[in-house]
Amino acid sequence: HKAGERTMEFRRMTSASHPDYEKAMALYRSSFPYHELREEASQERIMSHPQYHFDCVYDGTCWAGLILYWETESFIYVEHFCIFPKLRGQKYGQRALEKLNEKGKPVILEIDPPVDEISIRRKGFYERCGFTANPYEHVHPAYHKGYEGHKLIVMSCPEKLTEKQYGAFANHLRTVVMQDVFDA
């Protein structure tokens, strides 16, 4: 069926024992480079966190992808977002972001600096979805022991973040999202 004929919905998983968890993790692992992936123990630990949403994106009965985000009182931070490769280019990603925006809070995500064709295209995709790049120098903390943090561009919708909003996001990223990401 074509995208748009059915209602898009997010179905939340709260445990690694969910029957679709392994298929979801296979998509997750194949969609991001190692340095942008959580370690499995870390991923399993956060599944039940009240702010964390490990959501499967569905269009009717079609499982289109994953949107993994943190929701606070004042913003939503999309940590990971991916669509199954065979379904890319069919507006699932755009419609999933539109659905997230319906919550009426600023939506924040990070992208690689636009230096090659893929990263330039990705930035263009988010801009077409209403996101704007922010001017803040931003380093995402490392997901793995022995790795450096990585420089990323912070994008937000519906508008740029104020310094205060960026500060609140950066603090939440350090103290909640990235807390205990690898075992000491």
Where are these regions (language model features)?
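Conserved GNAT acetyl-CoA-binding A-motif
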Residues: 103-118
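Conserved acetyl-CoA-binding loop-helix of GNAT-fold acetyltransferases
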Residues: 83, 89-102
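Conserved catalytic-core motifs of GNAT/GCN5-like acyltransferases
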Residues: 34, 110, 123, 127-147
